[in-house]
């Protein structure tokens, strides 16, 4: 399957029988690992290190954000509702 915004070959890992919608945008595909039998629906945006275990479904319009240093891990058989925002990172503004 062809994607409009990145080359599937650039993904860190793409498991068997996984489906990625044509309009999914992945900012750092080299940091994204997708297990077997996963589905990422159209209009999803990913801009963080991501690991999807087997049988994960990300619904349409979701945003998984956090940058290169943060990570989101979705365990097997997990799912999101449409338009969910998952943000990884640390908002520690009190340091020094």
Please provide the spans of the model-predicted regions.
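Flexible, glycine/small-residue-enriched loop-and-beta-strand segment within the central core
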Residues: 22-34, 39-96
């Amino acid at each position: 399957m062809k994607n409009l915004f990145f080359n599937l070959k650039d993904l860190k890992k793409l498991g068997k029988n996984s489906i990625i919608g044509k309009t999914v945008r992945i900012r750092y595909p080299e940091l994204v690992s997708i297990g077997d039998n996963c589905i990422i629906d159209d209009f999803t945006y990913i801009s963080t290190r991501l690991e999807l275990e087997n049988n994960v479904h990300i619904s349409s319009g979701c945003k998984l954000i956090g940058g290169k240093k943060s990570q989101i891990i979705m365990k097997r058989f997990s799912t999101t509702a449409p338009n969910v925002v998952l943000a990884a990172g640390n908002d520690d503004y009190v340091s020094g």
